[in-house]
């Protein structure tokens, strides 16, 4: 195998999906610890001490203890190159998370074993199922009193509609948690408390019978019965079913104590797929093609206050990036030279010399790159499936200093290009209406406008509950519609015509009266 193909085969690009507070940031930190990317793990709980989780780098995230934006971390493990996309943990940032899932080849689902499958996990799994993304599952927090593990497997199978194949099994839980038993290698790993900040060589015992004294006779007998039950009732691991997205290998542990994470990572790097082929409008692109192709799935403004710029997160789908190369921007039809692409480590930026399929690199963006843009080495090719969602909450932006209107408009449009909020300019007023999927984005925008654009604003209620993008192939009918409904119409930050409805009934009536007009809740970037 050539060096080029070896490099592609090494890549594993994935995201972690979970409900907020299931332990995603903690497990991210432990993975970085195993990949030698950090020397000590700072947990989210240690925020008051000034130790902040490495992946939560934006100021507001540090204050609130949530992962607002997606950061990308690359590190080596088990002879693989891991590209970990850390996704927003807070429920208000689901749109960003959705788009991140378009850039990965597999996903790690973290379940809080105390609470079981939660709402946010269900939504994210639905996104993964659209693309048959392979899923590995980690049942977290077994050092607490959790739900029954068999019950947890049942819940995952019934609610998320995916078969579970337990790879190991917990021995007790809470204060009686003694470790895990490897169902495939007949090996017990014993748990000890107090090793969460380091890589600790937990004691392993080969053969279940040899661990009887270490775990105690009662737990041993319970474990024997449970193992018989699990082997009879659950699915065996099948690699093909996993790769097709029909079955998930399940690992048990506690990320806070760094227990069970290594076993999960070993399984993940062994079974998760290398970069996969990608669908474009024109054809399917294979990862091992020689020419560079890829797409932008995220834009982040002002990642570094020292550099007032924007970075476009670019997923390489095929070929090799080399410093200084020229690439073709499909949407604009122009050539671009990339002299200073970046690689990331949660806010630490360094220039990257080369990149292969599966890698995420940062392109400096001075306003010409948008989410969903495709780049090639000359071929006219656009990758599919990077959506924009209609916001669900709307507010009117009120400017404290009327002389700063230009700066406000610029700031709102630039921040909306990152995809967490959307800005609308109504036809018949000078208002600016901000829309978002959740309430928290409004706080984030106000704070970032103040710190990055020196604009202070507040919000007022606005008579809008729903937004739909308007499309019509008949220009005359579209113009008639614009005249008739100008009181409800606006342009979004990208210039797309949008219908802002005060009520669901209003929207329904408008749709019924205008059958030739398409009212869409999503639009492709």
Curated annotation (Swiss-Prot):
Residues 9-276 form the tr-type G domain. One of its GO terms (cellular component) is cytosol. InterPro entries: EF-G-like_DII, EFG_III/V, G_TR_CS, P-loop_NTPase, PrfC, RF3_C, RF3_dom_3_sf, RF3_GTP-bd. GO terms for biological process: regulation of translational termination. Keywords: Cytoplasm, GTP-binding, Nucleotide-binding, Protein biosynthesis. GTP binds at residues 18-25, 86-90, 140-143. GO terms for molecular function: GTP binding; GTPase activity; guanosine tetraphosphate binding; translation release factor activity, codon nonspecific; translation release factor activity, codon specific. Its main location: cytoplasm. It is found in: Cytoplasm. The keyword Cytoplasm applies. Pfam families: EF-G_D2, GTP_EFTU, RF3_C. It comes from the Bacteria. Transmembrane segments: none annotated. Belongs to the TRAFAC class translation factor GTPase superfamily. Classic translation factor GTPase family. PrfC subfamily. NCBIfam families: prfC, PRK00741.1, small_GTP. Increases the formation of ribosomal termination complexes and stimulates activities of RF-1 and RF-2. It binds guanine nucleotides and has strong preference for UGA stop codons. It may interact directly with the ribosome. The stimulation of RF-1 and RF-2 is significantly reduced by GTP and GDP, but not by GMP. HAMAP family: Rel_fac_3. This is Peptide chain release factor 3. It comes from Francisella tularensis subsp. holarctica (strain LVS). The lineage of its organism: Bacteria, Pseudomonadati, Pseudomonadota, Gammaproteobacteria, Thiotrichales. The gene is prfC.
């Amino acid at each position: 195998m050539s060096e080029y193909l070896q490099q592609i085969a090494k890549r594993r690009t994935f995201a972690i999906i979970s409900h907020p507070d299931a332990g995603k940031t903690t497990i991210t930190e432990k993975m970085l610890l195993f990949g030698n990317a950090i020397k000590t793990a700072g947990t989210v709980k240690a925020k008051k001490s000034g130790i902040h989780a490495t992946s939560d780098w934006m100021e507001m995230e540090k204050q609130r203890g949530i992962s607002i934006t997606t950061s990308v971390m690359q590190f080596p493990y088990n002879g693989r190159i891991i590209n970990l996309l850390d996704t927003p943990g807070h429920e208000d940032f689901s749109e960003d998370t959705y788009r991140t899932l378009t850039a990965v080849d597999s996903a790690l689902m973290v379940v809080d074993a105390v609470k079981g499958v939660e709402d946010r996990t269900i939504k994210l799994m639905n996104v993964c199922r659209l693309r048959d993304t392979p899923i590995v599952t980690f049942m977290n927090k077994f050092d607490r009193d959790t739900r029954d593990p068999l019950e947890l497997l049942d819940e995952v199978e019934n609610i998320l509609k995916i078969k579970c194949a337990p790879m190991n099994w917990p021995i007790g839980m809470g204060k009686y948690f003694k470790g895990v038993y490897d169902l495939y290698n007949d090996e017990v790993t014993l748990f000890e408390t107090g090793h969460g900040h380091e890589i600790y060589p937990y004691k392993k015992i080969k053969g279940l019978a040899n661990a009887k004294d270490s775990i105690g006779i009662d737990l041993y007998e319970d474990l024997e019965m449970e193992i018989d039950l699990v082997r009879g009732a659950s699915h065996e691991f099948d690699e093909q079913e996993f790769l097709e997205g029909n079955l998930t290998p399940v690992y048990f542990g506690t990320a806070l104590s760094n227990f069970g994470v290594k076993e999960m990572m070993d399984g993940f790097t062994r079974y998760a797929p290398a970069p996969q082929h990608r669908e474009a409008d024109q054809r399917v692109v294979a990862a091992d093609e020689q020419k560079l192709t890829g797409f932008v799935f995220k834009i982040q403004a002002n990642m570094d206050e020292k550099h007032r710029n924007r970075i476009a997160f670019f997923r390489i789908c095929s070929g090799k990036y080399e410093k200084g190369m020229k690439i073709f921007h499909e949407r604009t039809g122009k050539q671009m030279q990339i002299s200073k692409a970046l690689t990331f480590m949660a806010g630490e930026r360094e220039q990257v010399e080369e990149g292969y399929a599966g890698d995420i690199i940062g392109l400096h963006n001075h306003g010409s790159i948008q989410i969903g843009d495709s780049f090639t080495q000359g071929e006219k090719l656009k990758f599919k499936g990077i959506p924009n969602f209609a916001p669900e909450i709307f507010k009117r932006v009120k400017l404290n200093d009327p002389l700063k209107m230009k700066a406000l408009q610029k700031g709102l449009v630039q921040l909306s290009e990152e995809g967490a909020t959307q800005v609308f300019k109504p036809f018949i007023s000078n208002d600016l209406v901000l829309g978002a999927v959740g309430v928290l984005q409004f706080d984030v925008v106000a704070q970032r406008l103040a710190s990055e654009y020196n604009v202070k604003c507040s919000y007022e209620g606005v008579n809008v509950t729903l937004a739909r993008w308007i499309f019509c192939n008949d220009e005359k009918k579209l113009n008639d519609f614009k005249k008739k409904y100008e009181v409800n119409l606006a342009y979004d930050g990208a210039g797309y015509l949008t219908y802002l409805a005060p009520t669901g009934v209003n929207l329904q009536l408008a749709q019924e009266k205008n059958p030739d007009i398409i009212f869409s809740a999503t639009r492709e970037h």
